[in-house]
Amino acid sequence: MDVSDIINKIYRLPQTSLDTLIGSVSEVEYPKNFHLHRENKKETKSYFIKKGIVRAYTHKDDKEVTFWFGQEGDLVLPLQTLSAGLGEYATVELLEDCILYEIALERLQELYLNDIHIANWGRRYAECACIKSPCIMRPRWHRQQRSRWEWIHCLLR
């Protein structure tokens, strides 16, 4: 998926703002099992998934609990680091070799300060993530494992 399509899927930007944001990303490739973000670590980069699948998981009672799958077109943004300067609550791992668009969080913060359209794009992404979070977490609390996976599979369609 093209980076401009991914960006505009979240919030349509004027062409000059889109060009500025696109000019700040670079295409990278990482192998299966690579960790984009790690639990309890402050992160420095954000990613748009061009090709591939990732999962987000946390540890509970010495077990990995997967609660989100990202796929082509999704954004992997470390919101806790970006908004509060905290370590992340989850690890994000590649489930296959992936092609990603990468942007430094420091650069993203600069863009938020200097371009109101990009700042609104970031706000819109955060709003969508906040709305989606309870939907992702609820099945973890209330469903049996098989039912939970069926529900998550449904979200990926």
Task: Put a short name on every predicted segment.
Residues 1-27, 31, 81:
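Cyclic nucleotide-binding regulatory module and flanking cytosolic helices
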Residues 7, 22, 41, 97, ...:
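Generic anion/oxyanion-binding catalytic loop in active/binding sites
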Residues 9, 34-95:
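Cyclic nucleotide-binding regulatory domains
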Residues 10, 39-40, 115, 156:
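Short coil/turn helix-boundary motifs
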Residues 13, 62, 114-117:
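Alpha-helical structural elements of signaling/regulatory helical domains
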Residues 27, 69, 91, 100-102:
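Conserved hydrophobic/aromatic beta-strand scaffold that supports enzyme active sites
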Residues 93-96, 101-157:
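Polybasic "coupling" helices that flank or enter modular domains
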